[in-house]
Design a protein with these regions (language model features):
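A short secondary-structure junction signal
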Residues: 142, 189-191, 199-207, 231-232, ...
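Bacterial N-terminal signal peptides that target proteins for export
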Residues: 1-9
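Cleavable N-terminal signal peptides
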Residues: 11-12, 22
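C-terminal ends of transmembrane alpha-helices
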Residues: 196-200, 253-254
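Sec/Tat signal peptide C-region and signal peptidase I cleavage site
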Residues: 17-24
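Outer-membrane beta-barrel pore domains
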Residues: 26-31, 39, 59, 65-67, ...
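Outer membrane beta-barrel
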Residues: 26-198, 213-227, 303, 308-332, ...
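Loop-centered beta-sheet repeat module
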Residues: 203-250
Length: 391
């Protein structure tokens, strides 16, 4: 009964929101880009982003046996973004403060630093970055969460982001060199970062902690045909333009030595993706596989892998966008019965482009025996409604 009520509420909300004028443009005007303060060659742009969220469905567990339906209202993301140029237009900087899953059940509220970096834009083909920023792997993860097609990113890519560190592993201090050549037909980035560090708990088996490790090295390349170059990464283009990009990445950290026991492990990740859009239609495919190879017999080798395919179609005038995604995440391909399958369908409405929008998703998980979260249920359903205010 509660699920039917929730579905009816969601349909009603979207019916009201979509009831604006059926013509090109958004109900509340075009997107805003924050406030910019200029001082000669230096400038500062300030932006604020809020993502209120309501979840309902199989959110809590009755001990270890089954799920219980429950609702949860929280702020999925809070962002304060400060960015611009320093002294010259060839030196860019960014400082972004973040609060994730604020007041979500079971979450410890905390303010953190998502980005803190400086870039030297020596040339289109040569950009140097130093500071805290994303490591260059996973197409869907490199796209801003402000421009996601679907409310949450895929389960497998979220797991891959935790491969090279304990805390905020995907957003860690790095030094990188990247750029675009041949008018953007070829793009690249090569990065080095600390990865796993001394004292961090890396394996629950045997309570293994890190003694020392080599740096993590990451490289990504992208190719696009002439006339189909992507100007900036996004999942949702709101019916404008076209792009087609093939991407590949590899990341590796070796010689991660455990404390006291004398064993060590190596970690590698490889990935491949294809993304494209033409006017209102957008689609994306991504595959990632990673390996954790330990000399500790109690840990041995693990090989998770996952892929997803997602698509959406932006309907101009009413500014609605039906979306869907199918994902398979194998928690360890070295073992049997460890697959998780996730199906997502939803609808986005854009009132002011990405500056004000609302998305609603139904997410259905199916679990193999060895990755079930509870003993009595091998599936769960979650309903999500999320708004974004970005100014």
């Amino acid at each position: 009964m509660k699920r039917k009520l929730f579905a009816a509420m969601a349909v009603t909300v979207f019916g009201v929101l979509a009831g604006g004028p059926a013509h090109a443009g958004f109900l509340f005007g075009e997107e805003t880009k924050g406030v910019t303060i200029n001082n000669n060659e230096s400038d500062l742009n300030v932006r604020i982003r809020l993502q209120p969220r309501f979840d309902f469905g199989d959110l809590v567990k009755d001990g270890t046996s089954s799920y219980e339906s429950q609702g949860d209202i929280y702020l999925r993301r809070i962002r304060l973004e400060l960015g611009g140029h320093l002294l010259t237009k060839t030196i860019a900087y960014n400082l972004t403060l973040t609060g994730d899953k604020w007041d979500k059940a079971g979450n410890a509220n905390a303010i953190g630093i998502q980005y803190a970096y400086v870039k030297w834009l020596a040339d289109d083909a040569l950009v140097f970055t130093v500071g805290k920023e994303k490591l260059p792997f996973s197409r869907v993860s490199l796209s801003s969460s402000s421009k996601q097609l679907i409310v949450e990113r895929p389960v497998s890519t979220e797991a891959a982001k935790k491969l090279f560190g304990l805390t905020d592993a995907y957003y860690q201090p790095k030094f990188s060199v990247g750029g675009r050549l041949a008018e953007g037909l070829f793009a690249y980035e090569v990065a080095v970062a600390d990865g796993w560090q001394n004292g961090e708990a890396i394996q629950s088996t045997g309570a293994r902690k890190v003694l020392s490790a080599n740096p993590v090295y990451v490289a990504r390349v992208e190719l696009s045909p002439p006339g189909w170059v992507e100007k900036g990464k996004s999942d949702a283009y709101l019916g404008k333009g076209q792009h087609l990009t093939i991407g590949a990445n590899v990341a590796s950290q070796s010689g991660i030595e455990y404390q006291t026991v004398g064993f060590e492990e190596d970690r590698t990740l490889t990935g491949f993706d294809v993304s494209g859009h033409y006017n209102g239609f957008t689609a994306q495919f991504e595959y990632n596989a990673w390996e954790i190879e330990s000399t500790d017999p109690a840990i041995a080798t693990k090989k998770p892998k996952g892929w997803y395919a997602q698509a959406g179609y932006f309907i101009d005038g009413i500014n609605l966008e039906p979306v869907a995604r199918y994902e398979v995440y194998d928690h360890d391909s070295e073992a049997n019965d460890k697959e998780e399958k996730i199906r997502t369908v939803g609808l986005n409405w854009y009132g002011k482009g990405h500056s004000f929008k609302v998305g609603a998703n139904w997410v259905h998980h199916e679990f193999d025996t060895k990755v079930k979260e509870v003993t009595n249920d091998d599936s769960k359903d979650i309903y999500q409604v999320q708004a974004q205010v970005y100014f």
